[in-house]
Structure formats: C-alpha cells, structure tokens
C-alpha cells in the first residue's frame, strides 16, 4: 500500500521491508532507518540523497554485504556530508556512484579508508586518477619528505604512513573498479612498501650519522624482503616480512658498525610502527630472520654467512626462495642473495633425507 505525502510516494512499513529484503538487505529495519536519516530535512545532502538513493540501493544490493554498504554510505555523510561536495559529484557522475556502491558493499577496509579521506571518491570518476603510481613517482614524493622532515622523526613518520594509506587506497579503489588486474595491484602495493621502507631507512641512516658524529656511515645496511612481501604479493593490510643485514664499512670496526646498525634499525622501526604518529602502522615483521625471535634484529653479513652455512633449518632455506632486495645497500643485498641465499635455495646437489 502507498500513500502520498507532499507529492512523494511513501511505502508502508511492511512494503518497505519487503522491498529492502528483495534487494538483498539482511536487516531491512536498519536499512529503513538509514534511509530515513539520509533523506530527512531540507538540507542539500538530504535533497541529493532523495534523488540518488533509489539507484544507490539497487547498486548496493548487488554487493556481498548491502547492509555494510548502506551503513558506510551513511557514515560518509555523517562525517563529510555538510563539508564536502562529494554528494554533488556522485549525483553528476553515475559511473563514480556505481563504483562507490560496489566498493562500500564489498570492502570493509576501503569503506573505512574512504571515511578518513573522502576526497579519494573523486578518483572514481576518472580512470587516470586510479592508475597506480610508478616507482619513480613514489621516490620523488619520499625524497621530498626526506628533505622537508629530515630533522623531525614524528613528521617524517606521519608523512610516510599517510603516503602508504593514501596509495594503498588508490590501488584498492582501482582494483575494485576493474581498472587494474590482480597481479598489477599486488605489484603496485609492493612498490609502495619498497619506496617507503627505502626512504625510512635513508632517514634513519642520515640521523644516526649525525648522532654518531661521523661523516659517513660505519656500516651499509640492507633490507631483504621475505614471505609474501618478498614475492611481491602485498595486499591492503600486509606486514612487511624482512631480514635486516649490515656490513662494516672499510674504515669501521665491527663493534662500531654493530652499534650503528642497531640504532638505525631502532629509528627505522619507530618510523614504520612506533608511537610517533596516529597514522596506521607499517608492520616490519622480522620473525623470519636467523634464529627467529631469539636472534638479533639486525645481523652482520659475516654472521649470516656462518649461520646459514652451519645452522639453517630446512624451513629457513625454503623461506629464502622468496628473498629479494627491497631497500638500502643494493651491493650488500646482491652479495647476500648470490653468495648466501642462492646456493641454499637453488642447490646443485640432491636433497638429504632430513631435507
């Protein structure tokens, strides 16, 4: 049954419930409350919602979780509806509105991300804005942050973590919109991690050179990517599995190099995952290092050579299959991969019974 009120057709409660159930909503009563809240009043947002919600509800119903999608739509308006022009943009861009509905009803991660940076919605109207940035472009941005925040770890950490959030969101929106493939999205996310970790290591090395009062670094330090990170399969919320290795410079003894490397790693971890900023952490997971959680966070090249030759277990050798250079001293990484990792992961002899 329908009644007319101010020239608008209003469904009875029973009919509205049936309508929402037929679309795919699991909780039609909650959906009705959301729609009532979104369309109440004479404000600009309410007027636009009254225009676009019929189509929006249908598009949300095509997703895996229409209820989550409508809740996310309401959260966007509560957070930004009176301050942003995003609703007007969606009214004028059918393709962007449809893409947004697909994202909100299928991805909790991206729904939460959009509620932190509503300006990203505008990307949905232009495929060029959804293209993953090249490594070169990422390096330009991190280089600028290094120059700007070279003496402030909190500001640098905030810039790096915000960049990760921003770029992973871009790639996620692109993937959900069908602009880039699964494999390209994973590679693009890995590039973001590589660029940020490399810049963070550079910041830490520069800071500790100043702290130690030396002109050059007493040690070269490299980040070897492992696990899914090493396999370039980073997703929205992946940790960065890694091994950290140092090698003393020609004019430095191992004691000084070790002390320097430890302080650099301390800075690196603070930038990526310390309590220096409210931006989400970038977890640098070092559990795959020699001796696992019992081993030092950063190990010398010579120590790695001895450990892998004499003590490495079968699973540690297998873990090296995905090892690759990620950041820092490229020559040190190359030596580790060629001289230590390759003979273990690509053996020329037959496996033993234990292996």
Regions found by a protein language model. Name each.
Residues 4-355:
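A nucleotide- and high-energy phosphate-metabolite-utilizing enzyme signature
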């Amino acid at each position: 049954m329908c009644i007319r009120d101010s020239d608008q057709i209003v469904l009875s409660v029973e009919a509205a419930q049936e309508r929402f159930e037929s679309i795919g909503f699991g909780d039609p009563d909650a959906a009705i409350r959301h729609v009532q809240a979104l369309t109440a009043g004479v404000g600009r947002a309410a007027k636009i919602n009254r225009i676009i919600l019929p189509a929006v509800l249908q598009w949300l119903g095509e997703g895996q979780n229409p209820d989550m999608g409508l809740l996310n739509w309401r959260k966007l308006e509560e957070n930004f509806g009176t301050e942003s022009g995003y609703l007007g943009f969606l009214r004028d861009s059918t393709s962007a509105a449809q893409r947004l509905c697909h994202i909100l009803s299928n991805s909790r991660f991206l729904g939460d991300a959009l509620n932190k940076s509503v300006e990203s919605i505008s990307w949905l109207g232009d495929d060029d804005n959804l293209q993953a940035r090249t490594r070169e472009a990422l390096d330009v941005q991190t280089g600028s942050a290094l120059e700007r925040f070279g003496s402030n770890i909190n500001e640098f950490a905030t810039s790096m973590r915000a960049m990760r959030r921003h770029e992973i969101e871009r790639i996620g929106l692109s993937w959900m919109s069908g602009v880039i493939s699964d494999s390209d999205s994973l590679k693009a996310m890995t590039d973001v991690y590589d660029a940020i970790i490399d810049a963070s290591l550079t910041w830490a090395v520069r800071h500790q050179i100043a702290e130690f009062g030396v002109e050059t670094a007493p040690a070269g330090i490299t980040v070897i990517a492992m696990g899914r990170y090493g396999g370039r399969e980073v997703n929205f919320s992946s940790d960065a599995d890694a091994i950290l290795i140092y090698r003393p410079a020609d004019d430095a003894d191992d004691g000084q190099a070790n002390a320097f490397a430890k302080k650099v790693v301390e800075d690196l971890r603070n930038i990526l995952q310390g309590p220096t900023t409210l931006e989400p952490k970038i977890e640098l997971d070092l559990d795959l290092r020699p001796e696992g959680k019992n081993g030092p966070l950063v190990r010398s090249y010579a120590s790695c050579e001895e450990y892998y030759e004499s003590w490495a277990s079968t699973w540690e050798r297998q873990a090296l299959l995905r090892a690759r250079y990620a950041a820092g001293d490229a020559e040190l990484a190359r030596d580790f991969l060629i001289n230590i990792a390759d003979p273990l992961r690509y053996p020329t002899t037959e496996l033993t019974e234990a292996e």
